[in-house]
From Swiss-Prot:
Homodimer. Pathway: Pyrimidine metabolism; UMP biosynthesis via de novo pathway; UMP from orotate: step 2/2. It catalyses: orotidine 5'-phosphate + H(+) = UMP + CO2. Keywords: Decarboxylase, Lyase, Pyrimidine biosynthesis. GO terms for biological process: 'de novo' pyrimidine nucleobase biosynthetic process; 'de novo' UMP biosynthetic process. Belongs to the OMP decarboxylase family. Type 1 subfamily. The active site is at K73 (proton donor). Substrate binds at residues 22, 44, 71-80, 131, 192, 201, 221-222. Catalyzes the decarboxylation of orotidine 5'-monophosphate (OMP) to uridine 5'-monophosphate (UMP). It comes from the Bacteria. GO terms for cellular component: cytosol. GO terms for molecular function: orotidine-5'-phosphate decarboxylase activity. This is Orotidine 5'-phosphate decarboxylase.
Length: 245
């Protein structure tokens, strides 16, 4: 089974940057996409944009040559989650995610749903602990261990289920690579270039710091999308990463 839209998991670009398209409307998102190169970044479409504009937005971005991370964080009963992940594969997205807290049966069902797509399947990533959450937030929902400990617990479960990696804080990267292996992909939001505001992220790092600790893909939003010159800002971040490498 193959997608009619785009070859997605090709690894055709080397940039670790995924730009979050957190715009109020589709025209603004596409205007941004027209300012940057698909060789310099991938693009993330989240709940708000996808709810408003749906698969058409994904197709518009694919037509411009971009790999798309569909960030919908599926969390439901196993059968429903599996079908949702398969639907994402039909769209030809490069990456899709689920919540690790949905449990082993849910994650295993999602992984199995992608088997018919073979090499065309998107990367399947699980969310561990949202980077907006700290220890107090976890205690409020009955979790008494630290965010780092909870992230490690959920990452191990994700690895056991055969998924490709996790969304996590960059602060957990070193430990998760040790526990789950170098081939286990780490996707990190909460990445802010030096001098940027933290916004609603509490556990943040700079791009250079993230690469140094083993992050594979870093999600950056407003520091790039709200820049007066997004292409220049993106290129500056990429240049800073070559120094780390």
């Amino acid at each position: 089974m193959t997608s009619a839209t785009k070859t997605n998991n090709s690894g055709s670009i080397s940039s670790p940057i995924v730009v979050a398209l957190d715009y109020a409307n589709k025209d603004a998102a596409l205007a941004f996409a027209d300012q940057v190169s698909p060789q310099d970044c991938r693009l993330k479409v989240g709940k708000e944009m996808f709810t408003l504009y749906g698969p058409e937005l994904i197709r518009d971005l694919h037509q411009r040559g971009f790999d798309v991370f569909l960030d919908l964080k599926f969390h439901d009963i196993p059968n429903t989650t599996a079908r949702a992940v398969a639907a994402a594969a039909e769209l030809g997205v490069w990456m899709v995610n689920v919540h690790a807290s949905g449990g082993a049966r849910m994650m295993s069902a999602a992984k199995e749903a992608l088997l018919p797509y073979g090499a065309q399947a998107p990367l399947l990533i699980a969310v561990t602990v949202l980077t907006s959450m700290d220890g107090e937030d976890l205690r409020d929902i009955g979790i008494t261990i630290s965010p780092a400990e909870q992230a490690e617990r959920l990452a191990k479960l994700t690895w056991d289920c055969g998924l490709d990696g996790v969304v996590c804080s960059a602060h957990e990267a070193v430990r998760l690579k040790q526990v789950c292996g170098e081939d286990f992909s780490l996707v990190t939001p909460g990445i802010r270039p030096q001098g940027s505001e933290a916004g609603d992220q509490r556990r943040i790092m700079t791009p250079e710091q993230a690469v140094a600790v083993g992050v594979d893909y870093m999600v950056i939003g407003r520091p790039i999308t709200q820049s007066p010159d997004p292409e220049k800002t993106l290129r500056e971040i990429l240049a800073s990463l070559t120094k780390v490498a």
